[in-house]
């Protein structure tokens, strides 16, 4: 919006978050200015990394600083749209997530800190599918299974 710059947006968000008890978090399905968001006074950042992985990974410095402030990243890696979900399996989604992680580790993000400060989730909040809620329910089951696989591998 014309006339609504970063400083005004940051001030408005800071004012809003000052009225919210911690932990303070935000979820975004889109592709915002990640540097701007990662530098807000947030505790939790939830994002659609399934769609935005490459762009998000280019903000390694801001991600590292966010994690050093004990921020939590919720990696939305399981699509909830019917057609997209049908194209994937758990192993392809794990590989997709680990590819992003490897890029970040290669750019200086501490592996142990990142793993300790990470959660996984569905990528989006899609509730309109040809099969109604079935794909979303299957996505949550997949998240649980992926979580167990990743815990075994990394913890």
Name each model-derived stretch:
Residues 1-59:
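Active-site loop segments of alpha/beta catalytic cores
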Residues 43-153:
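Catalytic-face loop-and-helix region of soluble metabolic enzyme cores
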């Amino acid at each position: 919006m014309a006339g609504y710059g970063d400083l005004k947006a940051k001030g408005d968000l800071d004012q809003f978050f000052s009225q919210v008890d911690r932990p303070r978090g935000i979820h975004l399905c889109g592709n915002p200015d990640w540097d701007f968001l990662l530098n807000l006074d947030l505790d939790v950042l939830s994002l659609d990394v399934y769609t935005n992985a490459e762009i998000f990974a280019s903000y390694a410095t801001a991600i590292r600083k966010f994690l050093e402030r004990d921020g939590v990243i919720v990696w939305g890696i399981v699509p909830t749209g019917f057609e997209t979900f049908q194209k994937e399996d758990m192993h392809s989604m794990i590989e997709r997530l680990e590819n992003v992680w490897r890029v970040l580790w290669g750019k200086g993000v501490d592996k142990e800190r990142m793993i300790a400060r990470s959660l996984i989730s569905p990528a989006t909040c899609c509730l309109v599918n040809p099969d109604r809620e079935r794909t979303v329910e299957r996505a949550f089951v997949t998240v649980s299974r992926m979580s167990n696989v990743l815990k075994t591998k990394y913890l």
